[in-house]
Swiss-Prot record:
Belongs to the YajQ family. It comes from the Bacteria. GO terms for molecular function: nucleotide binding. Nucleotide-binding protein. The keyword Nucleotide-binding applies. CDD domains: YajQ_like. This is Nucleotide-binding protein Pmen_0939. The keyword Transmembrane helix does not apply. HAMAP family: YajQ. NCBIfam families: PRK05412.1.
Length: 159
């Protein structure tokens, strides 16, 4: 039976390239030079600046470099800024994988559409199976048309 998997993954190389581009952009900006920094560890960024409005500008720089590298900004989760001594800091994490709640929403959305496919949760992915390839393509179109709050990819399409 034909099937495909619904996953939410980040390309780590593109993410590091986007962060490096954001750091270069930060060094080029005259108003932010020397006053701000971006530190990267795994899937977490720490933005450091003298004022909160600078953090917002840095966040915009990070978003624009993510978009240039074709990474969806929905996977980025910015926490509230906090004061650390004389500087302001902000944590930015990148979410990856489909959690249980989102997987349940995806399965419910497919079932509500009454397509001739079955969806099953398998860890951090959702497996969709059907009798015909056309039914699976309808399911992909249905999922692309709905906003789930996370970027979704469709892989392992098998006949």
């Amino acid at each position: 039976m034909p099937s495909f998997d619904v996953v939410s993954e980040l390309d780590k190389h593109e993410l590091t390239n986007a962060v490096d581009n954001a750091i270069k952009e930060l060094d080029r900006r005259f108003d932010l030079r020397g006053k701000c920094s971006i530190e990267s560890k795994d899937k977490t960024l720490t933005l450091t600046a003298e004022a909160e409005f600078m953090l917002e500008q840095m966040l915009d720089i990070v978003r624009s470099s993510l978009i240039k590298r074709k990474i969806d900004c929905q996977c980025m989760e910015a926490k509230d800024p906090y004061a650390s001594g004389k500087v302001m800091k902000q944590e930015v994490t990148f979410r990856e994988g489909i959690d249980k709640e989102l997987a349940k929403k995806i399965v419910a959305h497919i079932k509500d559409a009454k397509l001739k496919v079955q969806a099953a949760i398998q860890g951090e992915q959702v497996r969709v199976t059907g009798k015909k390839r056309d039914d699976l393509q309808e399911a992909i179109a249905l999922l692309r048309g709905h906003e789930f709050g996370m970027p979704l990819q469709y892989n392992n399409f098998r006949d």
